[in-house]
Amino acid sequence: MHNPRKTHPLIKIVNHTFIDLPTPSNISSWWNFGSLLGMCLIIQILTGLFLAMHYTADTTTAFSSVAHICRDVNYGWLIRYLHANGASLFFICIFLHIGRGLYYGSYMNTETWNIGVLLLFTVMATAFVGYVLPWGQMSFWGATVITNLLSAIPYIGTTLVEWIWGGFSVDKATLTRFFAFHFILPFVVAALTIIHLLFLHETGSNNPSGLNSDSDKIPFHPYYSIKDLLGFFIATLVLMLLVLFTPDLLGDPDNYTPANPLSTPPHIKPEWYFLFAYAILRSIPNKLGGVLALVASIMILALIPMLHTSCQRGLTFRPLTQTLFWILVTNLLTLTWIGGQPVEQPFIIIGQLASILYFLLITTFIPLAGLLENNLLKW
């Protein structure tokens, strides 16, 4: 019998990806976040497209165009806040997705993992340039501070910064190009997502036991399509609660003041999802050192497959490493808190200790715990 679902060149790709995909029978709700990220990306691209129809990327009108969207465009306020809080939901899902990967040893699929690290960098770049667009105080000063970090690169730094700015300061040229980047990057993210899925489906999904599940696979549809639908409803509920009740909860009040190059806000800080990296950046009193630590704090994820020392894949049956994993999680929450605090004691020393512990846990303590657990298994 001719079944287009299995024979049509395009439909069969969808079939092998979302319908007849052999999936482990025991994956938990922690495996929902991949599809949730797909949902977030679609929400962001759609709301972003409608915002771009009304936004003007010019220093004189950018701020008022965002106000115009919220006041005069039909449901413009809803689209704007869905986009702003959708970014927060996106990062919550990303952090949980990466945390799941770390806990269950999903990073052993190295190609999938490395594309994921690349995706993280791209999404972070997208969020950064997007935050500049409303042209409020925090937009302007955030752009100034973060782009200025590139001047720490020896020899070419200053030239590079002025090239990115398109002048001698963050100005009209910077805003225009950031809008261009913010428009194109989500499509780069979408392309990388397809590659991420391609590599994942070469090996198949990992599962909570960390064992090979080839002997016990079930079709993705209807089992996990229905299960993912529950995740979609919960995530949408959380997003709508944020958007409709406390739309500015995660934003910065300073961004409701139009950008003013002559007035520096008392505390320059990025959106909450960058605070952990910002705290690591600030914990080093040297500019170049801080920039290197900032990049290393994300790039270290690419080293994790090489730092795996245990005989077992996940942490399900490894209580010692489990403890270290949760210490790492609390450490990252501490860094997030510190990133939003002013640069004064005791926050400086807490940030420095948390930064040191972050790198030590990943590069030293967790690999050593893996070796110790291997030896304990021989008793």
From Swiss-Prot:
<keyword id="KW-0479">Metal-binding</keyword>
<feature type="binding site" description="axial binding residue">
    <location>
        <position position="83"/>
    </location>
    <ligand>
        <name>heme b b562</name>
    </ligand>
</feature>
<feature type="binding site" description="axial binding residue">
    <location>
        <position position="182"/>
    </location>
    <ligand>
        <name>heme b b562</name>
    </ligand>
</feature>
<dbReference type="GO" id="GO:0008121">
    <property type="term" value="F:ubiquinol-cytochrome-c reductase activity"/>
</dbReference>
<dbReference type="InterPro" id="IPR016174">
    <property type="entry name" value="Di-haem_cyt_TM"/>
</dbReference>
<keyword id="KW-0472">Membrane</keyword>
<feature type="transmembrane region" description="Helical">
    <location>
        <begin position="178"/>
        <end position="198"/>
    </location>
</feature>
<protein>
    <recommendedName>
        <fullName>Cytochrome b</fullName>
    </recommendedName>
</protein>
<keyword id="KW-0249">Electron transport</keyword>
<comment type="function">
    <text>Component of the ubiquinol-cytochrome c reductase complex (complex III or cytochrome b-c1 complex) that is part of the mitochondrial respiratory chain. The b-c1 complex mediates electron transfer from ubiquinol to cytochrome c. Contributes to the generation of a proton gradient across the mitochondrial membrane that is then used for ATP synthesis.</text>
</comment>
<keyword id="KW-0408">Iron</keyword>
<dbReference type="InterPro" id="IPR027387">
    <property type="entry name" value="Cytb/b6-like_sf"/>
</dbReference>
<keyword id="KW-0812">Transmembrane</keyword>
<dbReference type="InterPro" id="IPR048260">
    <property type="entry name" value="Cytochrome_b_C_euk/bac"/>
</dbReference>
<keyword id="KW-0999">Mitochondrion inner membrane</keyword>
<keyword id="KW-0679">Respiratory chain</keyword>
<dbReference type="Pfam" id="PF00032">
    <property type="entry name" value="Cytochrom_B_C"/>
</dbReference>
<keyword id="KW-0813">Transport</keyword>
<dbReference type="GO" id="GO:0006122">
    <property type="term" value="P:mitochondrial electron transport, ubiquinol to cytochrome c"/>
</dbReference>
<feature type="transmembrane region" description="Helical">
    <location>
        <begin position="320"/>
        <end position="340"/>
    </location>
</feature>
<keyword id="KW-0496">Mitochondrion</keyword>
<feature type="transmembrane region" description="Helical">
    <location>
        <begin position="288"/>
        <end position="308"/>
    </location>
</feature>
<feature type="transmembrane region" description="Helical">
    <location>
        <begin position="113"/>
        <end position="133"/>
    </location>
</feature>
<dbReference type="InterPro" id="IPR036150">
    <property type="entry name" value="Cyt_b/b6_C_sf"/>
</dbReference>
<dbReference type="InterPro" id="IPR030689">
    <property type="entry name" value="Cytochrome_b"/>
</dbReference>
<dbReference type="InterPro" id="IPR005797">
    <property type="entry name" value="Cyt_b/b6_N"/>
</dbReference>
<feature type="binding site" description="axial binding residue">
    <location>
        <position position="196"/>
    </location>
    <ligand>
        <name>heme b b566</name>
    </ligand>
</feature>
<dbReference type="Pfam" id="PF00033">
    <property type="entry name" value="Cytochrome_B"/>
</dbReference>
<comment type="subunit">
    <text>The cytochrome bc1 complex contains 11 subunits: 3 respiratory subunits (MT-CYB, CYC1 and UQCRFS1), 2 core proteins (UQCRC1 and UQCRC2) and 6 low-molecular weight proteins (UQCRH/QCR6, UQCRB/QCR7, UQCRQ/QCR8, UQCR10/QCR9, UQCR11/QCR10 and a cleavage product of UQCRFS1). This cytochrome bc1 complex then forms a dimer.</text>
</comment>
<feature type="transmembrane region" description="Helical">
    <location>
        <begin position="226"/>
        <end position="246"/>
    </location>
</feature>
<dbReference type="GO" id="GO:0046872">
    <property type="term" value="F:metal ion binding"/>
</dbReference>
<feature type="binding site">
    <location>
        <position position="201"/>
    </location>
    <ligand>
        <name>a ubiquinone</name>
    </ligand>
</feature>
<feature type="transmembrane region" description="Helical">
    <location>
        <begin position="347"/>
        <end position="367"/>
    </location>
</feature>
<keyword id="KW-0830">Ubiquinone</keyword>
<feature type="transmembrane region" description="Helical">
    <location>
        <begin position="77"/>
        <end position="98"/>
    </location>
</feature>
<dbReference type="GO" id="GO:0045275">
    <property type="term" value="C:respiratory chain complex III"/>
</dbReference>
<comment type="similarity">
    <text>Belongs to the cytochrome b family.</text>
</comment>
<dbReference type="InterPro" id="IPR048259">
    <property type="entry name" value="Cytochrome_b_N_euk/bac"/>
</dbReference>
<keyword id="KW-0349">Heme</keyword>
<keyword id="KW-1133">Transmembrane helix</keyword>
<dbReference type="GO" id="GO:0005743">
    <property type="term" value="C:mitochondrial inner membrane"/>
</dbReference>
<dbReference type="InterPro" id="IPR005798">
    <property type="entry name" value="Cyt_b/b6_C"/>
</dbReference>
